[in-house]
Amino acid sequence: MHLALFGATFDPPHNGHLALCLFARELLGIDKLIVSVSNNPFKPESGRADVHRMRMAELLTQEINLTGAFSEVSGWELEKKQPSYTVDLLRYLRTLYPADKLTLLVGEDSFREFSKWKESETFCSLSDVVVFRRVSTQSESTPRPEIIPCEACISFVNFACDISSTLVRSVVASGRSISTLVPPSVHRYIMEYGLYAGEEHHATSIPEPKPRES
């Protein structure tokens, strides 16, 4: 079985997360996707309560599974109640799935901090790493494979996405609609609980919808 791990704070999950998961499934032939809700050790402020982020991540996996994919949420990192590290989760998954192929899915923004990640030099012994690089980003902004300790297991994939959680929070706080930015179920949840309303965030403008290719 081919397992993939995709971790984020999911504050909140958005259509970029959904698109990345579905794209990775088709591209890599993933059998099972584990969506892990994390606390970023480089950003001590946890943001929304864990219960909200977990529930929104569950809604994200439901959206993924509606397409015929198989995904599930892991709250293992949150249960530790301390800064979480990817290497610890990978080791935990290895105890559960010792014989299966494991791939870590990483966004470009997160990968910029890769050299600071705990025990990054051990990743190749635990999993492959696929970095989803923004198409509009210049290549020199992403660390080059040769300066990464475990370069043999790292692959780069171009991925077009202009959405971020920061943008979603900013749009909600400004009173504008996020219906094009997040999955419908996540949208309803944010509105129901009044998340992000009246908060101050820094973000760019809402991306223009891209025309469909014929």
Swiss-Prot record:
Keywords: ATP-binding, NAD, Nucleotide-binding, Nucleotidyltransferase, Pyridine nucleotide biosynthesis, Transferase. Coiled coil: none annotated. Catalyzes the reversible adenylation of nicotinate mononucleotide (NaMN) to nicotinic acid adenine dinucleotide (NaAD). GO terms for molecular function: ATP binding; nicotinate-nucleotide adenylyltransferase activity. One of its GO terms (biological process) is NAD biosynthetic process. Disulfide bonds: none annotated. Belongs to the NadD family. It catalyses: nicotinate beta-D-ribonucleotide + ATP + H(+) = deamido-NAD(+) + diphosphate. It comes from Pelodictyon phaeoclathratiforme (strain DSM 5477 / BU-1). Its EC number is 2.7.7.18. The keyword NAD applies. Pathway: Cofactor biosynthesis; NAD(+) biosynthesis; deamido-NAD(+) from nicotinate D-ribonucleotide: step 1/1. It is an enzyme of class 2 (transferase). HAMAP family: NaMN_adenylyltr. This is Probable nicotinate-nucleotide adenylyltransferase. SUPFAM superfamilies: Nucleotidylyl transferase (SSF52374).
